[in-house]
C-alpha cells in the first residue's frame, strides 16, 4: 500500500511541476493571472492523502509498515522544498496523526527526533505543531 502513497506523491509532484512550467512567467504576481500555486491539483493531492490514510489505518497495518509510512510522510516534503508541491506535502504531514496509535513508543521517539531535525519549531504550521505534540506525547 505504501507504493500507492509514493505514487500519489510522484504524480502530484510531476503535475505541480507541469502546472508551473505552463504558467506565464509572472502568473499570480500582484494578483494577476492564474497563480499556479492555487491550481486544483494541490488540494486534490491533500484530499487524496487523507482518504489514503483513512484506508490505510482501516487495513490494520503492522507497526513496521506504519513507521515506514510515517517516515515517508515526514521526510518527503523537505526533498521538494523549492517546489510548489512542498506546501501541500508539508500539510500532509498532519496525516501522521491517525497513525500515532499504531506506532511503537520507540518509533514515536525516532519520529520526534527526525521532526526536530527537519522542521524548526518556528517554521511549523499549527497542524504540524499539533502532530509534533501528539508524537511527543506518545513517545513518553
Q: Which residues make up each language-model segment?
A:
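Non-catalytic all-alpha helical scaffold/repeat segments
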Residues: 1-140
Amino acid at each position: 500500500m505504501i507504493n500507492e502513497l509514493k505514487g500519489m506523491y510522484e504524480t502530484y509532484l510531476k503535475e505541480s511541476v507541469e502546472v508551473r512550467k505552463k504558467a506565464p512567467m509572472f502568473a499570480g504576481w500582484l494578483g494577476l493571472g492564474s497563480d499556479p500555486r492555487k491550481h486544483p491539483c494541490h488540494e486534490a493531492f491533500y484530499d487524496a492523502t487523507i482518504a489514503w490514510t483513512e484506508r490505510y489505518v482501516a487495513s490494520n497495518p503492522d507497526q513496521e509498515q506504519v513507521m515506514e509510512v510515517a517516515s515517508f510522510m515526514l521526510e518527503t516534503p523537505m526533498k521538494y522544498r523549492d517546489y510548489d508541491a512542498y506546501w501541500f506535502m508539508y500539510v500532509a504531514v498532519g496525516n501522521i496523526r491517525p497513525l500515532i496509535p499504531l506506532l511503537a513508543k520507540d518509533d514515536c521517539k525516532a519520529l520526534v527526533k527526525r521532526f526536530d531535525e527537519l522542521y524548526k519549531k518556528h517554521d511549523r504550521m499549527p497542524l504540524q505543531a499539533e502532530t509534533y505534540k501528539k508524537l511527543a506525547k506518545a513517545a513518553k
